[in-house]
Amino acid sequence: MTMSRSSRSSVLALALATGSLVAAGPCDIYSSGGTPCIAAHSTTRALYSSYNGPLYQVQRASDGTTTTITPLSAGGVADASAQDAFCENTTCLITIIYDQSGNGNDLTQAPPGGFNGPDVGGYDNLAGAIGAPVTLNGKKAYGVFVSPGTGYRNNEAIGTATGDEPEGMYAVLDGTHYNDGCCFDYGNAETSSLDTGNGHMEAIYYGTNTAWGYGAGNGPWIMADLENGLFSGQSSDYNAGDPSISYRFVTAILKGGPNLWALRGGNAASGSLSTYYNGIRPTDASGYNPMSKEGAIILGIGGDNSVSAQGTFYEGAMTDGYPDDATENSVQADIVAAKYATTSLISGPALTVGDTVSLKVTTSGYDTRYIAHTGSTINTQVVSSSSSSTLKQQASWTVRTGLASTAAANGCVSFESVDTPGSYIRHSNFALLLNANDGTKLFSEDATFCPQDSFNDDGTNSIRSWNYPTRYWRHYENVLYVASNGGVNTFDAATAFTDDVSWVVADGFA
């Protein structure tokens, strides 16, 4: 039986009145609308009112063990404190994003396909567990922060739409975290991880890629990745009805059936949905009517494992059948009632904007060395009160407001050279460099870092990359990198990682 619009509104009103997330979740609403979820993924909350099973799994680097994160209560917010306790004094990766629908459509580390990922064997990277903290109704949770090279997939999903079968999907994303790479997607893709032709995908895309279609303004845009094209309307090119997005939290909705599809979106923190397109399949390119969907599920990557995009995912689901607008409107109201909000990205002793600091190594045998620079190379050098004024300046850094504004708003900072004003520490190919600020979005993100508690007891802080949150400032052979705790690069070696990424932040020499 289909729940009426008034009944769905009553269910939502009850949730608002009780201050609870459990009166009806998005997948309860989809089910009541006659289009049940066949996959439901979220690291932030349960998507069914009665769900109290696993949301996601994390693995810690210190001993390789895993733990499962569940809601605090049935239908509730994820138990972030369990993750924090498990991952204390080490790093953690999100290894599994569980399907809450009961179909077992879990998302795991994406395998190689048309493109290889950067991890061992061509697999994609896994997301760091702490890169995307938020609150829901005041309770802390973590999203999935996708850096370029990160991706999740299930090529053997059950119950997903294939061929020209109807389906719907939604996702809640970070509207400020994007790039123009291909392709930050969530949805239906090829089961082979290869590009098998036009119309073999149907996935939500978010970003500023203009290689195919694009919308009004400069983006970012919600679009549909239908394979070999990003679409926001009947045309495969420009579509004025698809607006640029400026919301911090974004609801993105895509649905498709035989010669019919729609694209909708809105502010996930307030208000209602807008319809950006509702009409027939693209007519200026072949292969999209009928569609040839294959039924795999992807997150953070393209159907052929394209891995150059970035974005943040909080929750999403895919349905059996083509949801009506009223059902989606009620899902949006439920998302708004969850009250997504930002929270601090930092921990440990605060670094004060405007202060000049020097950072001392804590690794035994190297602890007379400080972070300095020689030209554009960031390295460690032995520095003391008797060192030359030139060296003291090279080893001193002014703490600035983070150049990436979305991260700066939550505590992250940038480090300007004292002896080369206008130049900042940034990473490029994971090496730390001193470069002049060129004003680009990429530079701002590469030069923004989030201080946190030191991993060892000798330091005050570890310094984490904002846009690659699995990576920290590390000295390796006296040169500085942003390094992960184990990985494919020599400077990612797990041995001595804890000490090598822990620093004493002290008053600057100059």
Curated annotation (Swiss-Prot):
Give the UniProt keywords, A-Z: Carbohydrate metabolism, Disulfide bond, Glycoprotein, Glycosidase, Hydrolase, Polysaccharide degradation, Secreted, Signal, Xylan degradation
Could you tell me how activity relates to pH for this protein? Optimum pH is 4.8.
User: Which reaction equations make up its catalytic activity?
Assistant: Hydrolysis of terminal non-reducing alpha-L-arabinofuranoside residues in alpha-L-arabinosides
Positions that bind substrate: 225, 228, 303, 427, 429-430, 446, 475, 477, 480, 500
Annotated active site residues, numbered on this chain, are 227 (nucleophile), 304 (proton donor)
A Pfam family hit: AbfB
Annotated localization: Secreted
Task: List this protein's GO terms for biological process.
Answer: arabinan catabolic process; arabinose metabolic process; L-arabinose metabolic process; pectin catabolic process; xylan catabolic process
Q: One cellular component GO annotation, for this chain's record?
A: extracellular region
Q: What induces it?
A: Expressed in presence of L-arabinol and repressed in presence of glucose and glycerol. Expression is also pH regulated probably through the action of the pacC transcription factor and is higher at acidic pHs.
- Give this protein's Gene Ontology molecular function annotations: alpha-L-arabinofuranosidase activity
Q: What is its main location?
A: secreted
Which pathway does the database say it acts in? Answer: Glycan metabolism; L-arabinan degradation
- The residues that carry sugar chains are 89
Q: Which cysteines are joined by disulfide bonds?
A: 27-37, 87-92, 182-183, 412-450
EC supergroup of this enzyme: hydrolase
Q: Where is this site: Cis-peptide bond?
A: 182-183
Region (ABD), start-end ranges = 343-510
- Give the signal peptide range: 1-24
Q: What is known of its domains?
A: Organized into two domains: an N-terminal catalytic domain and a C-terminal arabinose-binding domain (ABD).
Annotated protein name in UniProt: Alpha-L-arabinofuranosidase B
- Organism the protein comes from: Emericella nidulans (strain FGSC A4 / ATCC 38163 / CBS 112.46 / NRRL 194 / M139) (Aspergillus nidulans)
Q: What is the lineage of its organism?
A: Eukaryota, Fungi, Dikarya, Ascomycota, Pezizomycotina
